[in-house]
From Swiss-Prot:
<dbReference type="InterPro" id="IPR050115">
    <property type="entry name" value="Proteasome_alpha"/>
</dbReference>
<keyword id="KW-0647">Proteasome</keyword>
<dbReference type="Pfam" id="PF00227">
    <property type="entry name" value="Proteasome"/>
</dbReference>
<comment type="function">
    <text>The proteasome is a multicatalytic proteinase complex which is characterized by its ability to cleave peptides with Arg, Phe, Tyr, Leu, and Glu adjacent to the leaving group at neutral or slightly basic pH. The proteasome has an ATP-dependent proteolytic activity.</text>
</comment>
<dbReference type="GO" id="GO:0005829">
    <property type="term" value="C:cytosol"/>
</dbReference>
<comment type="similarity">
    <text>Belongs to the peptidase T1A family.</text>
</comment>
<comment type="subunit">
    <text>Component of the 20S core complex of the 26S proteasome. The 26S proteasome is composed of a core protease (CP), known as the 20S proteasome, capped at one or both ends by the 19S regulatory particle (RP/PA700). The 20S proteasome core is composed of 28 subunits that are arranged in four stacked rings, resulting in a barrel-shaped structure. The two end rings are each formed by seven alpha subunits, and the two central rings are each formed by seven beta subunits. The catalytic chamber with the active sites is on the inside of the barrel.</text>
</comment>
<keyword id="KW-0539">Nucleus</keyword>
<dbReference type="GO" id="GO:0005634">
    <property type="term" value="C:nucleus"/>
</dbReference>
<dbReference type="GO" id="GO:0019773">
    <property type="term" value="C:proteasome core complex, alpha-subunit complex"/>
</dbReference>
<dbReference type="InterPro" id="IPR001353">
    <property type="entry name" value="Proteasome_sua/b"/>
</dbReference>
<dbReference type="InterPro" id="IPR000426">
    <property type="entry name" value="Proteasome_asu_N"/>
</dbReference>
<protein>
    <recommendedName>
        <fullName>Putative proteasome subunit alpha type-4-B</fullName>
    </recommendedName>
</protein>
<dbReference type="InterPro" id="IPR023332">
    <property type="entry name" value="Proteasome_alpha-type"/>
</dbReference>
<dbReference type="Pfam" id="PF10584">
    <property type="entry name" value="Proteasome_A_N"/>
</dbReference>
<keyword id="KW-0963">Cytoplasm</keyword>
<dbReference type="InterPro" id="IPR029055">
    <property type="entry name" value="Ntn_hydrolases_N"/>
</dbReference>
Length: 208
């Protein structure tokens, strides 16, 4: 029965449902987690990488993090072909907008709903992630504290047993001392150091 009403995003079922939108929301729920947290001195985005391989060029392989322009970045979850269209649209829109309201964090979904958040999570196990964020988030948290919280949330909600640098993407948006907005994506080596620093993984044993 539903097949008659799921061919377009604008066709409602007799119950008032948009099946294509529901399918897209389901795809997001099964995707790797993406978490955004607002700090008093910046924004931190962290995501779970589903595609991991020793053959990947890790320095250039980005699955979750995208730069929109010099002062806007995003983390995505769901079907990447859809995300790429939205990212390209956002890049065009960002070129036409220059009002400054400080650091902000927004989350949107396929239904067109969006809103400002202090901390948000999408993807697999997002309800558990939101629960931890509600409990541990502080309004005056620094960027360093927010990075620690983001890593903690992802490590506790991932489906896999352990969080490693190969399964993680982390980006920060902040002001430099010269008051320029900087978008920084952590390298695998930097991620490994962060995971060790915050007790998520053990330091690698030195070979003699």
């Amino acid at each position: 029965m539903s097949r008659r009403y799921d061919s377009r995003t604008t066709i409602f079922s007799p119950e008032g449902r948009l099946y294509q939108v529901e399918y897209a929301m389901e795809a997001i729920g099964n995707a790797g987690s993406a978490i955004g947290i607002l700090a008093k001195d910046g924004v931190v985005l962290v995501g779970e990488k589903k595609v991991t391989s020793k053959l990947l060029q890790t320095s250039s392989s980005m699955e979750k993090m995208y730069k929109i322009d010099d002062h806007v970045a995003c983390a995505v979850a769901g079907i990447m072909s859809d995300a790429n269209i939205l990212i390209n649209t956002a890049r065009v829109q960002a070129q036409r907008w220059d009002r400054n309201h400080g650091f902000q964090l927004y989350m949107s979904d396929p239904s067109g709903n969006y809103g400002g958040w202090q901390a948000a999570a999408v993807g697999a196990n997002n309800q558990a992630a939101q629960s931890i964020l509600k409990q541990d988030y502080k309004d005056d948290a620094t960027r360093e504290e927010v990075v620690q919280l983001a890593i903690k949330v992802l490590s506790k909600t991932m489906d896999s047993t352990s969080l490693t640098a190969e399964k993680l993407e982390l980006a920060e948006l902040y002001l430099t001392p010269s008051k320029c907005v900087k978008y920084h994506v952590h390298s695998p080596d930097s991620l490994t150091k962060l995971l060790v620093k915050h007790g998520v993984t053990q330091p690698a044993a030195e070979t003699s």
